[in-house]
């Protein structure tokens, strides 16, 4: 992971960039002193973030998530597109021995704060969250982000991935992609105007097979 992060940083430093001042210098304004309001959305992730993907069939996603949580211990923020998914995964992971806590809009505020506190205090745990519930909440100490489903937009992807690799720390973002989501995934990457490709996370299949059986 460290070698991959170093190569990513080298590519980012070598890429030319157009600043707002450069673009404004090319525009012929009628007003000598135009008022400029910048409304661009931040679509860059941290240089210390390692991004990867895992392609699998939909019925194997649970097993792949469990594999990630066992293979890469730490605090993992798992984004799910719907509340029903959170409600299904939390008891499943708990049954498998993974401390798992829900975060979604139908929880009382007190329960959300309690789950966040439990997640922060645990050295190894999973926080299952919807995008709406996670917005505006400062979740510190996240080691990994898992996109259990491909996000619906490029901005959502950046927002999710930005929950790790903060303040100079290293972090990992892994997208679980089933065949029906490949088109959306490619559209997100195109919208981000990223030239690099996302590497496929290596999977130890000898380790994954018994997980499927569970």
Locations of the language-model features?
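Interdomain coupling/hinge region of P-loop NTPase helicase/AAA+ cores
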Residues: 1-107, 201-205
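Switch/connector loops and helix/strand junctions flanking conserved nucleotide-binding motifs
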Residues: 2-3, 46-47, 87-88, 110-112, ...
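Arginine-glycine-biased low-complexity disordered regions
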Residues: 6-21, 70-73, 95, 153-154, ...
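Short, surface-exposed amphipathic charged segments that create phosphate/polyanion-binding patches used
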Residues: 48-53, 118, 211-214
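Amphipathic alpha-helical interaction motifs in eukaryotic regulatory proteins
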Residues: 50, 66-70, 90, 94, ...
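Conserved RecA-like helicase motor core of SF1/SF2 enzymes
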Residues: 97-99, 104-109, 121-125, 130-184
């Amino acid at each position: 992971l460290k070698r991959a992060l170093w190569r990513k940083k080298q590519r980012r430093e070598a890429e030319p960039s157009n600043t707002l001042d450069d673009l404004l210098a090319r525009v012929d304004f009628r007003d000598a002193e135009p008022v400029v309001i910048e409304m661009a959305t931040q679509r860059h992730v941290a240089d210390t973030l390692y991004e990867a993907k895992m392609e699998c069939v939909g019925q194997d996603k649970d097993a792949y998530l469990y594999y990630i949580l066992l293979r890469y211990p730490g605090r993992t923020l798992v984004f799910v597109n719907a509340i029903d998914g959170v409600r299904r995964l939390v008891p499943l992971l708990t049954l498998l021995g993974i401390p798992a806590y829900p975060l979604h809009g139908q929880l009382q505020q007190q329960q959300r704060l309690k789950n966040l506190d439990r997640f922060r205090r645990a050295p190894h745990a999973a926080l299952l969250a919807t995008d709406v519930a996670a917005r505006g909440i400062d979740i510190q100490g996240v080691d990994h982000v898992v996109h259990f489903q491909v996000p619906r937009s490029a901005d959502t992807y950046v927002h999710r991935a930005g929950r790790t690799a903060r303040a100079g720390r290293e972090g990992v973002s892994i997208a679980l992609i089933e065949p029906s989501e490949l088109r959306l995934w490619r559209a997100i990457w195109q919208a981000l105007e990223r030239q690099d490709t996302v590497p496929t996370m290596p999977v130890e299949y000898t380790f994954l097979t018994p997980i499927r059986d569970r």
